[in-house]
Amino acid sequence: MPFTLGQRWISDTESELGLGTVVAMDARTVTLLFPSTGENRLYARSDSPVTRVMFNPGDTITSHEGWQLHIDEVKEENGLLVYVGTRLDTEETNVTLREVLLDSKLVFSKPQDRLFAGQIDRMDRFALRYRARKFQSEQYRMPYSGLRGQRTNLIPHQLNIAHDVGRRHAPRVLLADEVGLGKTIEAGMILHQQLLSGAAERVLIIVPETLQHQWLVEMLRRFNLRFALFDDERYTEAQHDAYNPFETEQLVICSLDFARRNKQRLEHLCDAEWDLLVVDEAHHLVWSTDAPSREYMAIEQLAERVPGVLLLTATPEQLGMESHFARLRLLDPNRFHDFEQFVEEQKNYRPVADAVAMLLAGNKLSNDELNRLGDLIGEQDIEPLLQAANSDRDDAQAARDELVSMLMDRHGTSRVLFRNTRNGVKGFPKRELHTVKLPLPTQYQTAIKVSGIMGARKSPEDRARDMLYPEQIYQEFEGDTGTWWNFDPRVEWLMGYLTSHRSQKVLVICAKATTALQLEQVLREREGIRAAVFHEGMSIIERDRAAAWFAEEDTGAQVLLCSEIGSEGRNFQFASNLVMFDLPFNPDLLEQRIGRLDRIGQAHDIQIHVPYLEKTAQSVLVRWYHEGLDAFEHTCPTGRAIYDSAYASLINYLAAPEETDGFDDLIKSCREQHEALKAQLEQGRDRLLEIHSNGGEKAQQLAQSIEEQDDDTNLIAFAMNLFDIVGINQDDRGDNLIVLTPSDHMLVPDFPGLPEDGCTITFERDVALSREDAQFITWEHPLIRNGLDLILSGDTGSSTISLLKNKALPVGTLLVELVYVVEAQAPKQLQLNRFLPPTPVRMLLDKNGNNLAAQVEFETFNRQLSAVNRHTGSKLVNAVQQDVHAILQLGETQIEKSARALIDNARREADEKLSGELSRLEALRAVNPNIRDDELAAIDSNRQQVLESLNQAGWRLDALRLIVVTHQ
């Protein structure tokens, strides 16, 4: 190679060194100094892995002093290049810059610059980059983006609500599904969509203290959303890092009590500029016109400041119209400002609901009924629709569906309230109760007696709680020497049940973690029963491992022993046997226990076993739950209301279980209350609201589309290719499980989302649902999204050279494969990717500018090519540099037409969609006041900004491949 002192070269193997300068040479070697790092390299002159850096007219270069020059001419003087051009900061022309004075920190970012500088990538990285562009663009365009990545069953009614609400601007809704229908999952899906699309970035979740960990686990395990849990300690700690501690995290969970207890803390919460607020158990927010509770006022303050609000409640409005109004008032105080007016409005919706029921029944409509429909939808000419709906024509059903849809839009709260009931959703198992009455051991009798004497001053409530757990009373007196499990008949019964059902998985729930730990030891030591333990003292990872061991079919644990708090947020649908070693204090917790197994998707009827000790609070409670509320074998939406009204009497019976006088009357009274409330609920069921919330056929199709996407083999092939190239080890463990671990030769030292000790992944939804230790990989999983960002945000694979062995073409024929990206820059919240995601346009040009891309498919072509090592590649590039420049110019002239077509289509689509949405809502505003002014204004503003951003869209060269034909 001809070297001259002062020339600038770049290392082919260590491009991070920057620009090198020739500082010494002899007959056989040359020395380069790399000023940006201060390092020297000695190379052999004859075959050194370095490439001469030469810029061309039209390029912009930077001097070592920092000013830039636009090159007009390149001269050569004594083997050194001199660049002549216009200085950009002073606009001075005919400025010269000798190559020795170039900035040494020069980074080649354009694909063509990297190619000419010898920074040539491996061929497989170029292919990965193109696939990443192609798949990313396709994923952005998916109509159900944000709904596929969660570790959940594809349940239509949940998907329907999430799809509807998740795409709105700053959604403000009340999710009021019955227990077990998955409100938490619906809220998670909405959050996931809003965060993924950029519509929201900061989220605050406020829940009762006992549910904090459940939400933390659900958000992480199901949606890969890592929330920070704020309590007093975390708040104090964060005060050292920021004036407002809540600004130290983007995603926060805290308890309602934590939020309202301290005035300054509440102010900090209100000032933290959240995009979305989620409030669980919103029925605990007590409100009346005269005296709203402190909790209610705290949430009201937040709801006034946060644009998006999701309230979750399981209590139907029929059990308290005033509290129902209060929750709607939090969502839209302008719309729901007068309780009396609200009650009157609700009565007026009856005819709408009747009309829908009439249409759904499918019977011929009378003239009166047709007239009533005409009156209800009076502002539009629906005569043709009415005629079609009442005919025997093929389009009769479609006409009825459209009329139902029109009526839905007019329904008072259909945009702010969603409620599904078990009656309207299919797929739930039966629940069968098996009670086992056992004698009270003398040791417990003595302990209870002594406790009664010593605790005479205790409140009835405290005594009742003690009496529920006699083993705890006994242990308190006996201390560490107490071995209650040696005589407690429940332990003997449990061992007998487990040994006679060895092939079945059994979930055992008890109130305390200590009870679970002691039972595990007894089962293991006495009967050799494999039992996993699950309690609040364990980390999330430890609980995952326990859950995974329980889930394993052949070698896994037969039984999982859970404490009350430890089991929150976990579902074990693969098991159908539940043992309640003791009973919880209220019906909500009882339903939560059964809900661990009683979910949509449970394949078997649930067997609920309750071994209880006679003459204890357990015997009182088992009767009250079963005979008074029917809470074991059916969900009990009335449970909390009856529990609150019967609380004082019930506590007395629990505190003194031997006093049974009047208990039968209490049970009878509660049963009558339960039946009356249940009938009231059934009668007041809002069929229209249920139809709207359920989604019908549309929701079924959505679930089916996502299921088909689950079978996409492109994802598996791409992910494995990505892991290979990034340098992540893959170990196939069978059963559709793969273990990923970091290697020593990764593209980046720490791959975002991959733990240091690795992780287990699966591409199968069913496997992910039964194996909580396995991460469910979809296009929306952080591992894949981070991988796409890693490849596409840098220059990995942006320039390469390949050989094409093809005797039909002359040796040395040049082809250049160009990948342009058409894109628009805009704030993330505009969600521009719906219309114009970064879209790759591939060209395959010969030296005459003929584009062969349409005739030569990428993957087929890629398989015909072979790689070239970097050193040989650099020589090839230098030999054909002028030809490549000419082909690049031809590419620049051709891309404009394709790019303009893409941009024009995106503009048309955006205008049609956003204008159509705005027009529809403006028309509905006349008949449904629940459409907020700020929502209409936001859609209009969004439309204008989107169209303006699309006007500014452009294109750039993202990657190129030089192909040289050979016959060898």
Curated annotation (Swiss-Prot):
It comes from the Bacteria. Keywords: Activator, ATP-binding, DNA-binding, Helicase, Hydrolase, Nucleotide-binding, Transcription, Transcription regulation. Pfam families: Helicase_C (PF00271), RapA_C (PF12137), SNF2-rel_dom (PF00176), Tudor_1_RapA (PF18339), Tudor_RapA (PF18337). One of its GO terms (molecular function) is hydrolase activity, acting on acid anhydrides. Residues 490-685 form the Helicase C-terminal domain. NCBIfam families: PRK04914.1. This is RNA polymerase-associated protein RapA. It comes from Salmonella typhimurium (strain LT2 / SGSC1412 / ATCC 700720). The lineage of its organism: Bacteria, Pseudomonadati, Pseudomonadota, Gammaproteobacteria, Enterobacterales. The gene is rapA.
